[in-house]
Structures are given as C-alpha cells and as structure tokens.
A protein has these predicted regions:
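Alpha-helical bundle segments enriched in helix-capping/polar residues
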Residues: 2-436
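P-loop NTPase nucleotide-binding module
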Residues: 427-468
Length: 468
C-alpha cells in the first residue's frame, strides 16, 4: 500500500527528530570535553604559576598567569556558547516531539493545555472542544495568552464566524498561507520558550496602559528631586571635608518627604511592572522574528501584520525601551539596592517619568500590535494542525448560481479528528434545503453519536479556518 501524505510527513519528522538527537548527543560529548579542558587549564595553570612564583620568577609568573587566564576565559566562552546552543536545540527538539505526538494523537506526550468552555455553551462539551483529550488540546500550540483565547473563540463562536472582525474565509486564507511556513512558526514559539516556558501574557502588558499615572506636574517634581539629591550630596561632602554643620539634612528631609507624599501614586505601579520586562522581551523576540521575515507569496499575512511591518519606526525599538524602563523599576524587588539608588538619585521618579512618556506614545499602537500577534498566533496553531495533516482538505463555500440550487452541506470521507487514523471510520454526508433533516439509525454502539460529533466538530474546524 502506497504511503499517504500524512505517512510521509510522519516519517520525515521522525528522521528529523532522530538526526537532532544525534546532534544533541554529539554536543553533550563536546561539552564534556570543554569541561575537561577548563579543569586541565585551571590545574596546570595553578601548579605551574605557583611553582614559578616559588622560584621568585615574578615577571615570568605574571606572564604565565595571564596566558593561562586568557586560555581559560577563551575556552569558557566557547563552552558557554555551546551550552547556549544545546539549550536552544533541546527546546527546538521538544517542539518537534510535541508536534510528532500531536500527529500520532499520542496524548500522554502532548503538552497539556487548560481550556474552559463559556458558561452554558450549547455544544462545546458535547463536541469535545474542551477537556484533556479535546480538539483545543490537540490544536493549541499558541505561545501567547491572546492567541490561546482567540483560537478558542474561533471554535466556540463558529456560529458567528466574523465575531473578531475577520470572516472565516479570510481566516482560512491566512491559515493556508501560514501552513508551509513551519520554520517561522517554530522560530516564534522557540523565541518565547528561550525566555520562559510560560505563555506571553498580553493582558499584563495591556493593564500597564490602561491605568494612568496620576501625578500632577511630574516633570517639575523630577527636576526638584534631582536638585534636592544633588544639593544633599554637595552639602554632605562639604560637611565631611570642612566639618561644617549638617546642612545636608535639610534637603534630604525635603527629598524623603516628597518621596513619601508621592509613594501612594507610585506604589500601585510597581505591582504592574514587576517582572513585566520578561513579557516585553517575549513580545520583542516574536516581533523581531516577523521583522526579519519576508512574505512574498503571503499577501494575507502581510495585511494582518500591517501594523507591525509598515511602521516608520520599528516596534521592537519602542518595546525594548519600555522593557528597559520596567527593568529599572523592578529594582524595587531588591530593597537594599533600591534604597541605595533612591538615596543618590530620584531613581523611581525618573523612571516613572520615562514610563509615562513611553506609555503616552504607545497607548494606541501597542494594543494593535498585541492584537496582531494574537491573530497570527491563533492562525499559526491551525496552520501547524494543517501542516501535520496534509491529507486533510480545505472546506469550500458553496455559491448558488440558479434559483433552483439549494444551500446545504456536502462532505465526502468525513472523519473524526480525535480518533486515530488506524481506527477512524469515514462517512459521506449531504444535507440540503431548509427544513430538511437526516434521521440517523442503527444498533447500540454502532457509532451514531460519534457520527453526529464528527459532523459538528468538523463544522467548528471549518468555520474557524482550519482543514477537515
């Protein structure tokens, strides 16, 4: 029997996984060799240098110490570079193994994803859209919370196929164009995994924009605080060098009083920006991957990514700036460092001022970027599903040309996507005309309920933009 397209895809992925595992094993051997070299250079350098110093050959000893130090640092640099690449390779291998498990419906090796159906949803539970072995668990390979919510919305609201502003035909075209771009999908997923295994949380980023910084005349306050800290340092040095009275206590008291008066407005901000730079780094890495990509044959992808790829100034520049500001404010997580910095300069006020300016500039653009990433992420999840199942077909919308044509549903060889191919039974279906129905009969355990679920779950997939 001639292998199908899915069989060939499965064999190709298996060969790729085995080749990657061999590369990983070779890298592990090389890493062990680097460790031995580092240990050997350290021990040899210590023994030879100490012996030379004991002979009072200090200049020779200094030269040898420098040579061994340079050699050790060089080997360490190459070793660290290798370990970084091995870590990247390990994450990439996990992505490929997860995809292979989804192709084989190997549920124990599929990454677990939790989805909850909307309350009183008419068909989500009956059609196995949610649950541990559900359709969403199978197709959800998203890297962002917005993408995860969007792909679920496309399935839950398949009876409202334009609920997110994109028609289901546009979604299908987008998914079609993304299907062959497996390298782009893997790069975006890998970019976020290198930073954290947790999904990119767009809601946290949006919350930073929605809450305004309510400090009047912030720029003037920052200037005054800088003047007070500078005056405190100058007067403190004057007192230290000349023994003058402690006049530095006066500007310091005013500065501390100003800080505590504003702490009520600043404190809620820390809860939103603490560790937010990690989420921004994920967003930057994904957008940077898109900025480096070209889409010569994907006009729909270009249209969806228009807000990111057609900006005069690259979004990554603004987001990196915002990430550095959030890192600066996250110093509050280290109390001693935070106290020392604010004693020397108005650290918090300075970064709050910079944050206020950046937020004002990104208040409109950043939600659009996140929305674009969410749409692309959700479509990429369906595209990965289509890539893993090349035998599946893309549904087509029927168009009536005469008044005698009746609208309906036609399917040939329709099977349940959650049943393994070896055990899957396919059926044909044709239902036309308003008010018409099909009566499904059969004995117990003959597959009547499975057939009805097959029709329903494939309708959800089709209207979400995926193949069936």
């Amino acid at each position: 029997m001639e292998p199908t397209s899915t069989d060939r895809r499965e064999q190709a992925m298996l060969r790729l996984i085995h080749r990657t595992e061999r590369m990983q094993a070779q890298g592990a051997i090389a890493s062990q060799q680097f460790s031995r070299w580092r240990m050997g250079i350290f021990l040899a350098g210590a023994a030879i240098t100490i012996g030379v110093y004991q002979q009072a050959w200090f200049h020779t000893g200094n030269g040898l110490l420098l040579i061994f130090l340079i050699g050790f640092l060089t080997i360490s640099w190459f070793h660290q570079r290798l370990k970084s690449r091995l870590h990247r390779l390990q994450l990439w291998l996990e992505i490929k193994k997860d995809s292979f498990a989804r192709l084989q419906l190997d549920w124990p090796h599929i990454s677990a994803n939790e989805h909850k159906a909307p309350e009183r949803h008419p068909f989500a539970i009956d059609l196995d859209l949610t649950g541990p072995h559900s359709l969403l668990s199978l197709i959800d390979t998203t890297f962002s919370s917005i993408g995860q919510q969007r792909v679920a919305t496309w399935l839950f609201q398949s009876n409202l196929p334009e609920s997110d502003g994109l028609s289901w035909t546009t979604r299908q075209t987008l998914v079609k164009e993304l299907t062959p771009l497996s390298r782009l999908r893997d790069r975006c997923l890998l970019a976020t995994r290198l930073i954290s295994s947790v999904r990119l949380n767009g809601t946290r980023i949006i919350s930073l924009l929605e809450a305004p910084i309510s400090i009047s005349h912030l720029s003037l306050i920052i200037i005054a605080a800088c003047a007070l800290t500078s005056l405190t340092i100058v007067l403190g040095l004057w007192t230290l060098l000349t023994g003058a009275p402690n006049f530095w206590l006066l500007p310091l008291t005013l500065y501390i009083g100003t800080y505590f008066l504003l702490s009520g407005s600043i404190h809620p901000l820390f809860g939103r920006v603490l560790a937010l730079h990690e989420e921004l780094e994920k967003l930057v890495s994904v957008i940077a991957t898109l900025e480096r990509s070209t889409f010569p044959h994907q006009p729909t992808v270009l249209q969806v990514c228009q807000s990111i790829l057609t900006q005069q100034h690259r979004p990554t520049q603004s987001l990196k700036h915002l990430s550095r500001i959030c890192q600066g404010l996250s110093v509050k997580a280290h109390p001693l460092i935070h106290l020392g910095l604010n004693a020397l300069v108005p650290w918090d006020l300075w970064f709050v001022g910079k944050l206020n300016r950046v937020i004002s500039r990104l208040r409109t653009a950043l939600p659009d970027w996140l929305d674009t990433i969410g749409t692309l992420d959700a479509a990429s999840a369906l595209a990965r599903y289509a890539y893993l199942n090349p035998d599946y077909l893309w549904p087509q919308l029927e168009t009536t040309h005469t008044t005698t044509d009746t609208r309906g549903l036609t399917a040939r060889g329709l099977g349940h996507p959650l049943i393994a191919r070896a055990h899957r039974i396919t059926n044909d279906l044709e239902l036309r005309g308003e008010g018409h129905l099909l009566l499904v009969t059969g004995s117990n355990m003959s597959g009547k309920s499975t057939f009805l679920r097959t029709v329903g779950i494939n309708l959800c997939l089709a209207q979400a933009g995926g193949p069936v």
